[in-house]
Every structure is written in C-alpha cells, then in structure tokens.
Amino acid sequence: MLGTRRLLDGIVKTTVMVMIGFCAVGMGGVGEEKLTKIPEPDDNFSATLIDQRDVSSHITLFSLEGQTFLSGKRGGAMVSIPFGNIKEINFYARGRDIFAMVTMKKEPQVELEMEKDRVFYGQLSYGLLSIKVEYVKKTTIHSLAGQER
C-alpha cells in the first residue's frame, strides 16, 4: 500500500511538472504585439533602413514614434534634428549605449546618444515596419513624398 502511494505521488508530481513546462513554453510569445497600424507622421518621408543583420527595407511614412525628427543627447543637451535636414544616419554601440552619427545635407556631422528602446516606424510596399533604435544599423532619408532630393 505504501509503495502504491509513493508511485501515485511520483506520477502526480511528474504530471504537474510537465504541465508547468508546457505552460511556460506556451507563454513564450506573451508580450509580443502584432503590428496592425503605425503612427501617422505629419510629413511623409521615404527612407531606406538597414538593420543590424544587413536586411534593407525601403519605407514611406518613416518616423521615430510618429515624429519626423531625430532626437538624442549631445553632451548635456537634448537635440532634435528635422528629417528634412538629414541625409544619412549611422548607428553604433559604444559599451551599452547606442549612438547615431548624423550626416546632414548642409551642415557637418553630428553625433547623438540615442535611447535604444525608441522605435522607428514605416510603411513597406507589402506591410508595416517597426524596429527599435538599437537594431538599426543605417538609415538613408530620401525624400518627402512628392519631392525629390
């Protein structure tokens, strides 16, 4: 009788552990949201964005969280640069921080320290795009819709 009780306890414990394992695996996608819409910026910039895996995407309605300017720290100051003034942005890590080397259309380059959790959005020819700043390698801003640069 005592042996049967131990056997049943072992089966119950094993079953509970297996169920917990399945639940934990099944919850792996929790927190990941589907992208069904993007913030619509005031101006429609087109851009080519290359991520850290060298995947290139041509996008329209390009924005940084709905805004058409790049904001970051320069020394102790916050700086915002309108997309219309920017030719190209190269992102790189220095330690745990993310920096952007901004090539301007008419001014010298400017380096900004970025908040890596901020998100770029855009419209692809086949869908929508969102990507955190920390996963972007390079962005080239081409034009405002209807205008060639």
Feature roles, as predicted:
Residues R5-R6, V25, E33:
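Intrinsic-disorder/low-complexity peptide segments enriched for small residues
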